[in-house]
Amino acid sequence: MATLTDIGVAATINILTAFAFFIAFAILRLQPVNDRVYFPKWYLKGLRSSPIKTGGFASKFVNLDFRSYIRFLNWMPQALRMPEPELIDHAGLDSVVYLRIYLLGLKIFFPIACIAFTVMVPVNWTNSTLDQLKNLTFSDIDKLSISNIPTGSSRFWVHLCMAYVITFWTCFVLQREYKHIASMRLQFLASEHRRPDQFTVLVRNIPPDPDESVSELVEHFFKVNHPDYYLTYQAVYNANKLSELVQKRMKLQNWLDYYQNKHSRNPSKRPLIKIGFLGCWGEEVDAIDHYIEKIEGLTRKISEEKETVMSSTKSLVPAAFVSFKKRWGAVVCSQTQQSRNPTEWLTEWAPEPRDIYWDNLALPYVQLTIRRLVIAVAFFFLTFFFMIPIAFVQTLANIEGIEKAVPFLKPLIEVKTVKSFIQGFLPGIALKIFLIVLPSILMLMSKFEGFISKSSLERRCASRYYMFQFINVFLCSIIAGTALQQLDSFLNQSATEIPKTIGVSIPMKATFFITYIMVDGWAGVAGEILRLKPLIIYHLKNFFLVKTEKDREEAMDPGTIGFNTGEPQIQLYFILGLVYAAVSPILLPFILVFFALAYVVYRHQIINVYNQEYESAAAFWPDVHRRVVIALIVSQLLLMGLLSTKKAARSTPLLFILPVLTIGFHKFCQGRYQPIFVTYPLQDAMVKDTLERMREPNLNLKTFLQNAYAHPVFKAADNLANEMVVEEPAPDKTPDLVATKRGSRRFNSGSAETFT
């Protein structure tokens, strides 16, 4: 079990590591050769030019202005200087609201920490319960926790009052933040520039028709049922094979660029390659000619495949993007049932074109339920099997367990410095390593489930990651760690005493989570700003592949916030903070340092680095709110169970009302604010349409929407325009009959539609 000395060693290691990362970043960002790595967002916006083009030869690679090194930490105040409205214009609402999650943590935990250290720590410290318990492993730092309060003590009333303070304050902050972000979302949508998704809905599960193709059926259906507002449609094609060919060609082009650059450095020698297995065997040929030939052949295949996709009705997917003349028409269509059969002609608000995950649009809609069931089972087993490495991590936090497993290492382990390193630093870094591959696995699972937008993929992945963190990192660490630390106590006492030992031991797991917070939340966040991996990859690409300025821009990897991994990780800190605030407040300062440091670092990254792939207008906030509420309820239930083992019979029943009040609060927020994040108000749509009609009376909306939702691999294809030509019915008139290939079918008792 980690002692105060071990925590001090871990803090020293992580503080020095974080400081080293900041120093390295401050120096690297000043070098002209790294400018595109640390400021890619400004290059993508066209607001920054390369400093390599100016100055002497040495100044193209190294910053020779020594005065700039004196101000090497000025990036911190610069990151905080940009006001929030300007930041929304610069980076989008998603990025700004993501930053507000860190502010939410500071708003919740700073007042709680002040109260806890003023009231709770003296109450816990001024006891000697742990000293009187036999066969119990503890350290001095555990005397600051509720474990040091004797069984049946009246001091538990203080912890009860603290639980009420935590609950009411957290709910108050959550409600104000929910209200503010809902207002920000409505204001953002009202002031946003015209975008294709504002006029478009995605229609799925289009029923097959023997007389008409999907394209003809879509046009006919919406001309008949939305005659006044329907404008045009974009068919959805299964172009996955074409995408694979395009990706393959891009890889071949990279190899061609590499060998052409190599040849340009040494024109007297043509580069050669072997065309056998892995380039190690086979005939030796001219590399440039070889790749030119392969690219030409693949280009012909791409052209043929594109023609096949565009001309074959089998490539059409039973889905379409349908656009309307006004936002009002799109709102009505997306929020109403289109057919008597509620399983057909399903409509939803279309994601913006950047947000679409095209590979999943080709999946049959009927498969989605089966796919999600399969993934649910797979996720259960993934969570179960990951308990093994989590249990292994807990053995690292227990010196006695390591010494029993490998007794020959006991002399080395007992060295004070080594012991402090193992207990204070190694468990946190080991857990971090085991979790590295998890986000990639969860993203693959989310893609298999069939979500059609990147934002929904990230939200589902975040949901899975959160559940995994809660079960394995939080619960499993507590249970396994308690069992390993108090194994001797379990074996030498009666069964009736075991719940008491568990009740005492759970608060004592705070030391393990402190080490994890320092590794992940301190050094990990500092490592994010260094961008070591993108730095190396950029320079490798710049040396081997880049020939033009366009190539250099493509070599930049600005990255994104990474909501699917970042938000669940933040939620783990909310759980830890709320659970341990009333039982072991020593955890709170470490969490506050994380929230403050992460806010500054990620604000800098959002301003200078990250380039979001999509904009959802903070649609993820209901998930954030719900998970904080779950963390609050978990903290109440655990405190309830903890006090029951402490025989606090008079105070424990008063905790039962807290989960009920918290659930009621969540239901209120869900009914009051969540609809704003799910639907778009008709009133706002009409206002925006009216203003646009007054400002731009001659707007040609069809031209604006014509190729907005064409698949990226053939978005510029001219022959798609023919499918977009639609006659506009005259306003305020009875719609003309729409031509159709369908035969006459009179409705009678024998032809009634069946519902499946």
Curated annotation (Swiss-Prot):
The keyword Phosphoprotein does not apply. Pfam families: PHM7_cyt, RSN1_7TM, RSN1_TM. It comes from Arabidopsis thaliana (Mouse-ear cress). GO terms for cellular component: membrane. It is a multi-pass membrane protein. The chain crosses the membrane at residues 7-27, 101-121, 154-174, 373-393, 425-445, 465-485, 510-530, 574-594, 628-648, 651-671. Its main location: membrane. Acts as an osmosensitive calcium-permeable cation channel. InterPro entries: Csc1-like (IPR045122), CSC1/OSCA1-like_7TM (IPR003864), CSC1/OSCA1-like_cyt (IPR027815), Csc1/OSCA1-like_N (IPR032880). It is found in: Membrane. Residues 746-756 have a biased composition (Polar residues). Belongs to the CSC1 (TC 1.A.17) family. This is Hyperosmolality-gated Ca2+ permeable channel 1.5. Keywords: Calcium, Ion channel, Ion transport, Membrane, Transmembrane, Transmembrane helix, Transport. The keyword Secreted does not apply.
